[in-house]
């Protein structure tokens, strides 16, 4: 038995962790059979993606897109009329169609969070080089009741956590590999950060990972104050990381804007006449429609943020 553990321990431990995580997070995740927390908002938004209805909201669209994919794949409500979801941004329990199930909408958050524990395990294992230490710390994530309840709902955090931990794990893996840090490493990190930001804008805090990666990459030049070498490296690493990030972020918005081919109940979200005209003409995937739609979406996000009360602890 000890020989098996020594030979396959590097694989058995994370596999065991994943199995436990899937059981904890995935068992009966369709319960409760009613909406709670922000599910009332996100379910309505996800359904609009399925039906091609234009909408805007304060968060980028990737999370709702994945919820729409989950609902489509599971198909638990394929025989239910869900048109009421397109007529509101907040679906009350009374307005929800009778017999509606939430397993499809909850699928991405539940299982992406369940799988993200592998990234967390990998981060701690890479740092400590002790698989049992990594397993012990990972257990804190798996058995955190608040995290489990939050992730088993139609919420954005479980989805975003997958990309956040994925980005951190990738950075840790690169800097602990002992190999030279190359431009593709910055690019892949940029993709992962872009995905996290495309779920919620607060993912922009992960831009600090670029600074950390560059610091490790150029540590010798930093110690020796080789300013010219540092600037030359910055000139190539910044585009290498930021360009993929922007392509991911704006690419997701391009799909989001293109999918919005219909306005329901005159819910225009203060869209400009130019944007509405592209929708009427069925040209939402055109580059010009994207430019106008992106500007309108960003304005909506900014105006919504301006209306949020500022934290005052005094």
Which residue stretches match the model-derived regions?
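Transmembrane-helix signature of polytopic, membrane-embedded enzymes
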Residues: 79-92, 120-143, 178-184
């Amino acid at each position: 038995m000890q020989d098996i553990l020594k030979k396959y321990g590097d694989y058995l431990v994370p596999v065991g962790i994943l199995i436990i995580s899937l059981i904890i997070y995935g068992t009966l995740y369709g319960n409760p059979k009613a909406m709670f927390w922000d599910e009332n908002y996100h379910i309505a938004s996800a359904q609009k993606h399925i039906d091609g209805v234009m909408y805007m909201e304060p968060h980028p669209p990737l999370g709702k897109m994945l919820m729409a994919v989950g609902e489509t794949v599971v198909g638990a409500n394929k025989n239910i009329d869900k048109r009421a979801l397109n007529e509101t941004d907040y679906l009350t329990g009374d307005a929800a169609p009778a017999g509606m199930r939430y397993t499809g909408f909850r699928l991405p958050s539940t299982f992406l969070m369940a799988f993200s524990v592998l990234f967390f395990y990998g981060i701690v294992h890479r740092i400590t080089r002790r698989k049992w230490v990594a397993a012990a710390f990972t257990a804190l994530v798996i058995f955190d009741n608040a995290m489990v309840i939050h992730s088993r709902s139609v919420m954005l955090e479980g989805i975003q956590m997958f990309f956040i931990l994925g980005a951190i794990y990738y950075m840790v893996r690169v800097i602990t590999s002992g190999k030279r840090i190359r431009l593709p490493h910055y690019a892949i990190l940029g993709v992962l950060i872009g995905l996290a930001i495309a779920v919620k804008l607060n993912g922009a805090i992960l831009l600090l990972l670029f600074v950390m990666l560059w610091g490790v990459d150029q540590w010798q030049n930093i110690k020796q104050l080789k300013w010219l070498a540092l600037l030359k490296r910055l000139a190539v690493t910044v585009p290498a990381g930021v360009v993929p990030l922007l392509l991911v972020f704006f690419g997701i918005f391009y799909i989001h804007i293109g999918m919005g081919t219909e306005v329901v109940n005159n819910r225009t979200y203060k869209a400009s006449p130019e944007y509405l005209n592209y929708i009427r003409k069925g040209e939402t995937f055109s580059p010009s429609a994207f430019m106008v739609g992106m500007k309108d979406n960003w304005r909506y996000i900014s105006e919504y943020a301006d209306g949020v009360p500022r934290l005052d602890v005094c």
